Amino acid sequence: MAERKVRVRFAPSPTGALHIGGVRTALYNYLFARQHGGDLIFRIEDTDSNRFVPGAEEYILESFKWLGIQFDEGVSFGGEYGPYRQSERREIYKKYVQVLLDNGKAYIAFDTPEELDAKRAEIANFQYDASTRVGMRNSLTLPKEEVEALIADGKQYVVRFKIEPNEDIHVNDLIRGEVVINSSILDDKVLYKSADELPTYHLANIVDDHLMEVSHVIRGEEWLPSAPLHVLLYRAFGWEDTMPAFAHLPLLLKPEGNGKLSKRDGDRLGFPVFPLEWHDPKSGEISSGYRESGYLPEAVINFLALLGWNPGNDQEVMSMDELIRLFDLHRCSKSGAKFDYKKGIWFNHTYIQQKSDKEIAELFVPVLKEHGVEAPFEKVVTVVGMMKDRVSFVKELWEVCSFFFVAPTEYDEKTVKKRWKEDSAKCMTELAEVLAGIEDFSIEGQEKIVMDWIAEKGYHTGNIMNAFRLTLVGEGKGPHMFDISWVLGKEETLARMKRAVEVLK
């Protein structure tokens, strides 16, 4: 038998912003597909029309575009297995619901929500299963004629899966090994509702995966309890031979490790849990995103890849190509992964250092414009090269290097008190004269002449340099002094020195 082609899918519901845990699931599917020369399918699971949120689907697609996770087929991408939106597959699902009814694997139930609530009040831990279905209003207990009459009269119903009692169900998981669950703990899940003529998640999921020839289902651990039901559905349809392999990924946990990561954790600790900023159309609430917070997509990808997986060595920084080469589902953890958001910041810092000065400068130009600064691009590149090792986010560059673009209008009081001596005004006036006479205003050209002048005058080097820095920067920060004066140029350097002497003398 020929080896089966790898086909995996990511199938979100358009119910709001995409959680960062969903991004990791999509990433692992993408890495697995690329490593095996397979296909990644983008499917929209919109069977629950009540939870539909306008703009959510577009948001999800934009998130993956930013992150560089590319789909091969699906909604917005086309393909031979469509339609890829579940709400457009109603007739397909109806056909397979009928297959289960015809072979006795499912039945029709007419119980109203009120009747079910009454049962729950009457019986502790009530579930609709082999022990209780005999006392309910369904096609197993009602005469065939009555069932047909109720349907003809427009009586609303659901189709339930008929779970056989006390049967061991084996789920082979690529991460967790064999998981065995007894069917007695499962209820007769609703597979279809006549009210909206749509299936529930479970039926649509199985039918779509089968018809789209999905080879591996890689999804979050929260779906592990549903896996036995899915195995039974494959068996009921006679699809066991082509049932996909399962891999249930570890949960993303709170930074403290106690419980599942939520948006509240991000709000509490100040980090995003969504890839992009999200404007909730219902509540009006705006939630922060990794892109708008200044994270580089490569850093987010690298950070997420290591939440629940490791390459088997100490390597941490990996490009997408390296991740594709190294990724192995068998190296995924069974236990949850703490969401160490500080590690995400470290990755962003690392990737900023790895990018060229020109690339970071291109990202910094919009920040400068926000502050009303228009500067020659060559100057921006030079400044970035000097200062990027001091920041973890591009927007932080403004905090550490704004003085390169805007002259100080005031001078830090603590620095003035500590660094501006009685003779500083006189010394800076003399230094300005020395600098004015320098023809070669390069870093080396300035340094040699100024240091010779200091030695000749017998001045204290630290006092001169501290005062010089204060005149150009306005405080005691910044790189090497002659780097600053070289970038500013002779004219701007002398103008700043003159103004500082006038203000501070």
Curated annotation (Swiss-Prot):
Give GO terms: molecular function aspect only. Answer: ATP binding; glutamate-tRNA ligase activity; tRNA binding; zinc ion binding
Instruction: State the reactions this protein catalyses.
Output: tRNA(Glu) + L-glutamate + ATP = L-glutamyl-tRNA(Glu) + AMP + diphosphate
Q: Where is the signal peptide?
A: none
Keyword annotations: Aminoacyl-tRNA synthetase, ATP-binding, Cytoplasm, Ligase, Nucleotide-binding, Protein biosynthesis
Q: What is its EC number?
A: 6.1.1.17
For the ligand (ATP), the binding residues are: K263
Motif annotated as 'HIGH' region, chain positions: 12-22
What's one GO BP annotation on this UniProt entry?
A: glutamyl-tRNA aminoacylation
Where does the motif 'KMSKS' region lie? 260-264
Which InterPro entries would you find in this protein's record?
aa-tRNA-synth_I_cd-bd, aa-tRNA-synth_I_codon-bd_sub2, aa-tRNA-synth_I_CS, aa_tRNA-synth_I_cd-bd_sf, Glu-tRNA-ligase_bac/mito, Glu/Gln-tRNA-synth, Glu/Gln-tRNA-synth_Ib_cat-dom, GluQ/Sye
Primary location: cytoplasm
Keyword Cytoplasm belongs to the record: yes
Q: Is the keyword Transcription regulation assigned to this protein?
A: no
Question: Which top-level enzyme class is recorded in the Swiss-Prot or TrEMBL entry?
Answer: ligase
**Which Gene3D superfamilies has this protein been placed in?**
1.10.10.350, HUPs
Main function: Catalyzes the attachment of glutamate to tRNA(Glu) in a two-step reaction: glutamate is first activated by ATP to form Glu-AMP and then transferred to the acceptor end of tRNA(Glu).
Q: Quaternary structure? A: Monomer.
Belongs to which family? Answer: Belongs to the class-I aminoacyl-tRNA synthetase family. Glutamate--tRNA ligase type 1 subfamily.
Name under which the protein is recorded: Glutamate--tRNA ligase
Q: Which gene encodes it?
A: gltX
